[in-house]
Each structure stands twice: as C-alpha cells, then as structure tokens.
Amino acid sequence: MFMADAYFADTVWYVGQIIFIVAICLLVIIVVVAFLATFKLCIQLCGMCNTLGLSPSIYVFNRGRQFYEFYNDVKPPVLDVDDV
C-alpha cells in the first residue's frame, strides 16, 4: 500500500513538472508574440510617417524643380541693348 502511494506521488510530481514546463513555454510564446506584434506596429507606424511626411516633401521638391526647369526653358532670352 505504501509503495503504491509513493508511485502515485511520483506520478503527480512528474505531471506537475510537465504542466509547469508547458505553462512556461506558453508564457514565453505569448511574450515573444507580443514583442513581435509591437515591433511590427512600430514598423508600420514608421512607414506611415514616411508616407505622410517624406513622400509629399519629395513630390513637392520634384514638382518645384520641374517648374523651375520649365520656366528657364520658356523665358525669352535677354536682349542685347546698346548703351544709350
């Protein structure tokens, strides 16, 4: 009878260890997934800042340069005027 109780206690201890290991693994997985989700959100926010801030600036710069080049192409040349 005593031996059966000892085996039962060992079995409960092993099952407890397995449950503990599984719980730790699940906790680690949850923490890693939360970290990766946070990292992904930061990357998306940086992309949004790029879209809202940098891209319009580049567009305005390029359009301004195009207008400047167009103006220089269409303006009439300076006429040579004799000194009066």
UniProtKB/Swiss-Prot annotation:
It comes from the Viruses. The gene is E. The chain crosses the membrane at residues 19-39. Residues 40-80 are intravirion. Pfam families: CoV_E. Plays a central role in virus morphogenesis and assembly. Acts as a viroporin and self-assembles in host membranes forming pentameric protein-lipid pores that allow ion transport. Also plays a role in the induction of apoptosis. Keywords: Apoptosis, Host Golgi apparatus, Host membrane, Membrane, Transmembrane, Transmembrane helix. This is Envelope small membrane protein.
